[in-house]
Amino acid sequence: MQNRMISLERNTNETQIDLTLDLDGTGRYEVDTGCGFLNHMLELFARHGRFDLVLTCHGDVQVDYHHTTEDVGIALGQAFARALGDMRGIQRYGSFYLPMDEALILCAVDLSGRCTLNWDVHCSTEKVGDFDVECAKEFWLGLARSVPATVHFVQFAGENTHHILEACFKGAGHALGAAVKIDEAHKDEIPSTKGLLV
């Protein structure tokens, strides 16, 4: 099987990001974004997706966490895109219902080569600690655009904002973990009748 580990840097005037992603890992992680809550979400994502992720981000957190969160999503999406290449042999689709106490989230993914984000998630508070809840959507929009991929989040239940967002990131880990798996019976095929995924 081809090596699906990618290292990349993404530097702007707002953030400097260095990351290594291994799609065929075991769920190990070392994450430092300067935002404790975002670190926690990325660690959950890596653990439940069985991705190995080493990521550091130095961002303009003195402003807020918006640029850091969005740019980490963009960079992580770019890493997925490079690691997947022409998508040959992957399952392509993945979905997962994730219960987190009273919260229940569905995440469904299609590595279609087309960007769509459906964010049907409703939180009752604007912040978790010092993290702006609206930044979570920006993270997933950045990732979906960069892969590019179709990503749906649908909330069926939930009151606690931390639980809701945790279910989103864990569920996405499971869904993406399933989508990137190699289908051994069709490992030389691109999973599309078009012959390519764009």
Short names for language-model regions:
Residues 1-198:
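N-terminal intrinsically disordered, cationic/polar leader segments
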